[in-house]
UniProtKB/Swiss-Prot annotation:
Organism of origin: Arabidopsis thaliana (Mouse-ear cress)
Subcellular compartments: Plastid, Chloroplast
Gene3D superfamilies according to UniProt: Cell division topological specificity factor MinE (3.30.1070.10)
GO CC list: chloroplast; mitochondrion
Gene transcribed to yield this protein: MINE1
Protein name (database record): Cell division topological specificity factor homolog, chloroplastic
Length: 229
């Protein structure tokens, strides 16, 4: 740029550029790095002024024999912390640069053609599956009275075939499955199958053995011994 009273020249110099392989943090250039702007004027006085305008940045302005020089440098006491997303991207790029040719090819293949398992585990599919489970639960939810009737009907049906240990221990459990929806399962403690419905011959078999300590040095033993009629 030409001026009638002199020549104006602006120059920028960066001595120590930021190293891109730094993975942990993002910092300003070191204290030896500088950016200077130099201009020439026809008349001027000798002066030197230093101003620290922002944390980590100092600006010096020098006027010597008609030459104005402005120097901006990093004081080394200020750092910029990257966001988690920037850290992840920087780490990914750093690892990709250090990969071999076949590793890069394999990575590119996985990005372009993701596996079936990766597609299934996507956030959209997970959200859809959860919604499906909630809908199943809403459609299959029953009242407490209905649950008691379910338990009573099951006990009545099983009593024709087995001897139930205790009706009070019968439990109704409700669970949710991703593919099947809401599952109702009933736990019934059974003492034994009734003789007329037994699949094997239990003649002479001892079952339901119980031990009771009498606290006088002896033990009472009770058991069932099946003798067919």
């Amino acid at each position: 740029m030409a001026m009638s009273s002199g020549t104006l020249r602006i120059s920028a110099t960066l001595v120590s550029p930021y190293h891109h392989h730094h993975r942990n943090r993002l910092s300003l250039p070191s204290s030896s790095s500088k950016v200077d702007f130099t201009g020439f004027i026809s008349n001027g006085v000798n002066s030197l002024e230093t101003q620290k305008c922002t944390p980590g940045l100092a600006i010096s302005r020098e006027n010597t024999r008609g030459q104005v020089k402005v120097l901006a440098r990093n004081t080394g006491d200020y750092e910029l912390s990257p966001s988690p997303a920037e850290q992840e991207i920087e780490s990914f790029l750093y690892n990709a640069i250090n990969m071999g040719f076949f590793d890069r090819l394999n990575l590119a293949w996985k990005i372009i053609f993701p596996s079936h398992a990766s597609r299934r585990s996507s956030n959209a599919r997970i959200a859809k599956q959860r919604l499906k489970m909630i809908l199943f639960s809403d459609r299959c939810d029953v009242s407490d009275e209905a649950k008691r009737k379910i338990v009573n009907n099951i006990i009545h049906a099983l009593s024709d075939f087995v001897e139930i240990e205790s009706e009070e221990k019968v439990q109704l459990n409700v669970s949710t499955d991703g593919d099947l929806g809401t599952i109702y399962s009933v736990t019934v403690p059974v003492r034994r199958v009734k003789p007329e419905y037994q699949d094997v011959d239990e003649a002479g078999t001892i079952t339901n053995v119980e031990y009771k300590d009498t606290r006088d040095g002896s033990v009472d033993v009770r058991f069932d011994f099946y003798v067919p009629e």
